[in-house]
From Swiss-Prot:
Source organism of the structure: Kluyveromyces lactis (strain ATCC 8585 / CBS 2359 / DSM 70799 / NBRC 1267 / NRRL Y-1140 / WM37)
Phenotype reported upon loss of the gene: Still produces pulcherrimin, but grows poorly when producing pulcherrimin.
Record's keyword annotation contains Transport: yes
Gene designation: PUL3
Protein name per UniProt: MFS-type transporter PUL3
Gene3D superfamilies referenced in this protein's UniProt entry, alphabetically: MFS general substrate transporter like domains
Keywords, sorted A to Z: Cell membrane, Ion transport, Iron, Iron transport, Membrane, Transmembrane, Transmembrane helix, Transport
Length: 460
């Protein structure tokens, strides 16, 4: 079957979005299963606290760059070359992180800071997607593919961690082990994909905005929107923050629980997170199908009209177009609400596994498996939201300032990555430990559902 030019172009867009997801996923996950042991190896006496510092500082840098990356792309006049530069930063950060054993403990932090800056690619991708397509359905599909690819790449990242965890050799006196070999491999994989992106990425036209007033005007347009539109945008930004917060529960508590409580090795942790990521991929993969399912369930039965004038037909077509937009909006909000309930189930599993282990109700291995099931379900909810929330947010943004403002949703996700380790570390130190940390996330999910019910009743 021969593909048409439009189909080739569409598949090229799919490939580009898939490749963009690699860096963000690898930087988030490859180091994760061995970080506690690596921190110990580099000389830290308090690996839990240093893990908090690594994640919080890296997230802070990501937040800072995510807020300004849209302005940088607008200033440069090219989203493509900004993404490629961020990929190169990721290569440098991972390589530096891998060399920490030969330099100092703080080299770990330096590498993660650079990777944090590179992870602002997770924000600029929203500008890229909305710049290369104007069709709302295609945009939602691209967001779903991005989240699906990110989930698959998270699983592949753990496969890299597992395979290279078997390494144990020296190069000119420097020892390559399971602690740094995966990030060495990751750095060169990212460099290779950086080269591929030079040929695959489109370079959509971006209006160069070198006057600082243009950035202020973009923010003024956002906050001067109608009250319904502004409230809806703020609700969606909150839910993007929330989705990242319970994603960070997975990233923060997984190495702590499985390493320090269950006692699993790096390879077993890698398998656990790979399973969670693969199962979580179903969230973004089936998101478009769920939206269609919600549409079928909510579509009222209509009777055919036999006699209609031309004017009536035109009015009917216009009415149907508005109805289609409102239906898509309503069904994507329904998907977001569904995602929150899925996340609640996963968080309940995580608490149950921790309580079962602490009260000797389950053996360590069984508790680890039960905890991994909770991780998987939570990741499923996260990926549902990762597909629906950005697509909804793009509906409320003025097309003239999308390049500058769409990364804002990635920046808010970065705020979630920054706040989560601070809050979770503080709660983990209390007598209740992990259960109160995860339980706090469940409370946030619970209080967020009414705002989405309100949003579902709104019309575009």
């Amino acid at each position: 079957m021969k593909l048409t030019d439009s189909q080739k172009h569409l598949y090229s867009q799919y490939l580009a979005v898939t490749l963009i997801a690699v860096q963000f996923s690898f930087d988030t996950c490859v180091y994760l299963s061995s970080v506690v042991q690596y921190v110990k190896e580099c000389g830290s006496d308090d690996p839990e606290n240093y893990l908090f510092i690594l994640q919080a500082v890296s997230a802070a840098v990501q937040v800072f760059f995510s807020f300004i990356i849209g302005d940088i792309a607008s200033y440069v006049g090219s989203i493509k070359w900004v993404i490629i530069f961020l990929y190169f930063l990721s290569f440098v950060g991972n390589f530096l992180y891998s060399c920490a054993g030969a330099v100092s403990l703080n080299t770990l932090l330096g590498g993660r800071i650079i990777c944090g800056a590179a992870s602002s690619s997770g924000a600029v991708v929203y500008s890229y997607i909305t710049a290369i397509s104007k069709d709302r359905t295609t945009i939602f599909k691209l967001f779903s593919i991005y989240r699906t690819s990110a989930g698959i790449c998270m699983a592949l990242a753990q496969l890299v961690a597992i395979l290279f965890a078997l390494c144990d050799f020296t190069v000119r006196g420097y020892r390559i082990t399971s602690y740094n070999a995966p990030t060495f491999a990751s750095s060169f994989i990212i460099l290779l994909i950086c080269v591929l992106l030079m040929f695959v990425l489109e370079n959509p036209p971006v209006k160069s905005a070198r006057n600082p007033k243009n950035y202020l005007d973009a923010w003024k347009k956002f906050f001067s929107a109608g009250s319904n539109r502004l409230i809806a945008s703020l609700i969606l930004l909150w839910n993007m923050f929330l989705s990242t917060f319970f994603m960070c529960e997975v990233l923060y508590f997984m190495p702590i629980f499985l390493t320090l409580n269950v006692g699993w090795k790096t390879e077993y942790e890698g398998v656990a997170f790979m399973v969670s990521a693969v199962l979580g991929v179903a969230g973004s993969f089936f998101a478009p199908d769920l939206v269609k399912l919600f549409a079928k369930l909510n579509t009222p039965s209509t009777q055919d009209e036999t006699d209609t004038s031309d004017n009536d037909k035109i009015e009917k077509e216009e009415s149907e177009q508005k109805s289609d937009i409102n239906t898509l909006h309503r069904n994507q909000v329904s998907l977001t609400i569904f995602a929150l309930f899925v996340a609640l189930i996963g968080q309940a599993f995580m608490i149950g596994a921790s309580e079962a282990l602490s009260n000797d109700k389950l053996p360590k291995t069984n508790s680890g498996i039960f905890f991994t099931a909770g991780l998987s379900i939570t990741m499923l909810g996260y990926n549902f939201m990762g597909s629906s929330v950005p697509a909804l947010f793009s509906m409320y943004i003025d097309p003239q300032v999308k390049v500058q403002l769409m990364p804002f949703i990635g920046a808010i996700a970065g705020v979630g990555k920054l706040v989560a380790p601070i809050v979770l570390a503080a709660l983990y130190k209390t007598p209740l430990g992990l259960p109160i940390g995860v339980g706090f996330g469940m409370i946030l999910v619970g209080i967020s559902i009414p705002s989405l019910v309100y949003l579902r009743r709104n019309k575009m």
